[in-house]
């Protein structure tokens, strides 16, 4: 995977994100459908995903829509096999959805989603 061109990496991760969303259990799938999920080709060392916005139920109707960014090149570089990449994309997506649902890092770690 690391030898692929950057746009191929982004396309691959976009497909994996779509597959992950389709197979999420409720209520995670419904939460994912409320979010703008973007796959970015920027190489961000040590950062696979980022949640930006106000967590669900925290109020502030004036806030921008909640967004998750998945960093395709960082994931592809660190997880070169398809199986490892598929697993990590799903794990990253679930982790960031957890932030949207109001979970902090210790909550996520307690659920095995660090």
Name what the model sees in each region.
Residues 1-18, 47, 65-66, 75-78, ...:
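Phosphate/ribose-recognition catalytic cores of enzymes acting on nucleotide-derived substrates
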Residues 10, 83-84, 94:
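A generic secondary-structure micro-motif detector
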Residues 13, 87, 97:
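Charged, low-complexity surface patches
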Residues 16, 21-69, 83:
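Auxiliary, metal-adjacent structural segments of Zn-dependent hydrolase domains
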Residues 23, 27, 92, 96-100:
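Short alpha-helical functional segments enriched in proximate histidine and acidic residues
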Residues 52-90, 100-114:
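Active-site scaffold of zinc-dependent metalloenzymes
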């Amino acid at each position: 995977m690391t030898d692929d061109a950057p746009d191929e990496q982004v396309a691959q991760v976009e497909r994996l994100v779509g597959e992950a969303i389709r197979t999420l259990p409720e209520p995670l799938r419904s939460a994912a459908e409320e979010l703008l999920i973007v796959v970015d080709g920027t190489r961000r060392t040590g950062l696979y995903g980022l949640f930006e916005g106000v967590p669900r139920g925290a109020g502030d109707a004036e806030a921008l829509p909640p967004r998750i960014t998945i960093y395709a090149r960082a994931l592809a570089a660190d997880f070169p096999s398809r199986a490892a990449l598929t697993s990590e994309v799903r794990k990253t997506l679930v982790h960031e959805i957890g932030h949207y649902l109001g979970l902090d890092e210790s909550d996520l770690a307690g659920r095995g989603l660090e």
